[in-house]
């Protein structure tokens, strides 16, 4: 299992990486949506992307729209953000995200969302 963690916060990227690597997931990171697209285009395929909404250069919503438009349908996308309004959730899902997780969260909440998405990883 390979995951791409996309967030402009180094702390959040490190936190998510720690949670996922404990579960045996190989992780790469990007600090904005454009950097994430560059990684998707130049790396081995990713199974999962955890994507923040608000980022510089290219936000998470635009990134998800782009990867879906480019045919990357096999990447499961979990939006991980502080945006709580229903409009953000609906727009994320309409753009092609598979699920939505509110910050702050813990390991159990992340595991539950991944299970809902059909992502099979080891228990922490």
List each language-model region with its residue ranges.
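Charged docking surfaces used in two-component/phosphorelay signaling
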Residues: 14-22
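Acidic, metal-coordinating helix/loop segments flanking the phosphotransfer/catalytic sites
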Residues: 29-48
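Receiver (REC) domain active-site loop signature in two-component systems and cognate sites
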Residues: 55
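C-terminal output helix
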Residues: 105-114
């Amino acid at each position: 299992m390979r995951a791409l963690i996309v967030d402009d916060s180094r702390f959040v990227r490190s936190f998510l990486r720690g949670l996922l690597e404990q579960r045996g997931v190989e992780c790469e990171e990007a600090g904005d949506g454009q950097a994430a697209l560059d990684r998707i285009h130049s790396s081995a395929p990713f199974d999962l992307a955890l994507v923040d909404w608000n980022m510089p250069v290219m936000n998470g919503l635009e990134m998800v729209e782009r990867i879906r438009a480019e045919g990357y349908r096999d990447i499961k996308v979990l939006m991980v953000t502080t945006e709580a309004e229903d409009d953000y959730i609906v727009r994320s899902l309409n753009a092609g995200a598979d699920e939505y997780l509110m910050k702050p969260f813990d390991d159990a909440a992340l595991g539950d969302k991944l299970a809902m998405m059909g992502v099979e990883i080891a228990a922490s």
